[in-house]
Amino acid sequence: MAGRRGDSDEDLLKAVRLIKSLYQSNPPPSPEGTRQARRNRRRRWRERQRQIRRCSEWILDTYLGRSVDPVQLQLPPLERLTLDSSEDCGTSGTQGVGSPQVLVESPAVLESGAKE
C-alpha cells in the first residue's frame, strides 16, 4: 500500500508521524496584543509554516523517494460526464448533504486493469 519504490507501510507511518509533529510544533498565533504585534506574529507563523512545508517535502522526497507532486490522472472529456438525478436527494433536513454521483464511461486508462 505504501509506495512506489518498495518502501514499507512502517516507513510511510514514520514519515507521517514526523511531519505531523512538525506541524503540531507550530500552533497558530494568539489574537492578543496590538495590531502590529498580531501582524508580526502571523508573519512569523506563516514563515515557519513555509519552512515546515519545505521540510515535509524534503522528508517525502529523500526518506521515501517520493515526489510531492501528485501523479497526473487522465480524465475523460467533460461531454461524457453526466449527473444521475434518479437517486433520492435525501429526507428533509438532509437535502444537499453528500456529493452528487457522477457517471462516467470507462476511459482507456481504467480499461487496462483486470478483465472479468
UniProtKB/Swiss-Prot annotation:
- Regions of biased composition (Basic residues) lie at 36-46
Question: What positions does the record give for the motif labelled Nuclear localization signal and RNA-binding (RRE)?
Answer: 34-50
Modified residue Phosphoserine is at which positions?
S8, S92, S99
Q: Which Pfam families does the UniProt entry name for this protein?
A: REV
Name one process (GO BP) from the record.
mRNA transport
Task: Reply yes or no: does the keyword Transferase apply.
Answer: no
Quote the subcellular location field of this record: Host nucleus, Host nucleolus; Host cytoplasm
List the signal peptide residues.
none
Listed Polar residues bias regions: 88-98
Q: Give the main location.
A: host cell
Which segment of this protein is annotated as the motif Nuclear export signal and binding to XPO1?
73-84
GO terms, molecular function: DNA-binding transcription factor activity; RNA binding
Other remarks in the entry:
HIV-1 lineages are divided in three main groups, M (for Major), O (for Outlier), and N (for New, or Non-M, Non-O). The vast majority of strains found worldwide belong to the group M. Group O seems to be endemic to and largely confined to Cameroon and neighboring countries in West Central Africa, where these viruses represent a small minority of HIV-1 strains. The group N is represented by a limited number of isolates from Cameroonian persons. The group M is further subdivided in 9 clades or subtypes (A to D, F to H, J and K).
Which family does the similarity line name? Belongs to the HIV-1 REV protein family.
Tell me the function of this protein. Escorts unspliced or incompletely spliced viral pre-mRNAs (late transcripts) out of the nucleus of infected cells. These pre-mRNAs carry a recognition sequence called Rev responsive element (RRE) located in the env gene, that is not present in fully spliced viral mRNAs (early transcripts). This function is essential since most viral proteins are translated from unspliced or partially spliced pre-mRNAs which cannot exit the nucleus by the pathway used by fully processed cellular mRNAs. Rev itself is translated from a fully spliced mRNA that readily exits the nucleus.
Fill in the domain comment: The RNA-binding motif binds to the RRE, a 240 bp stem-and-loop structure present in incompletely spliced viral pre-mRNAs. This region also contains the NLS which mediates nuclear localization via KPNB1 binding and, when the N-terminal sequence is present, nucleolar targeting. These overlapping functions prevent Rev bound to RRE from undesirable return to the nucleus. When Rev binds the RRE, the NLS becomes masked while the NES remains accessible. The leucine-rich NES mediates binding to human XPO1.
Tell me, how does this one assemble? Homomultimer; when bound to the RRE. Multimeric assembly is essential for activity and may involve XPO1. Binds to human KPNB1, XPO1, TNPO1, RANBP5 and IPO7. Interacts with the viral Integrase. Interacts with human KHDRBS1. Interacts with human NAP1; this interaction decreases Rev multimerization and stimulates its activity. Interacts with human DEAD-box helicases DDX3 and DDX24; these interactions may serve for viral RNA export to the cytoplasm and packaging, respectively.
Q: What is this protein called?
A: Protein Rev
Q: Species lineage, top-down?
A: Viruses, Riboviria, Pararnavirae, Artverviricota, Revtraviricetes
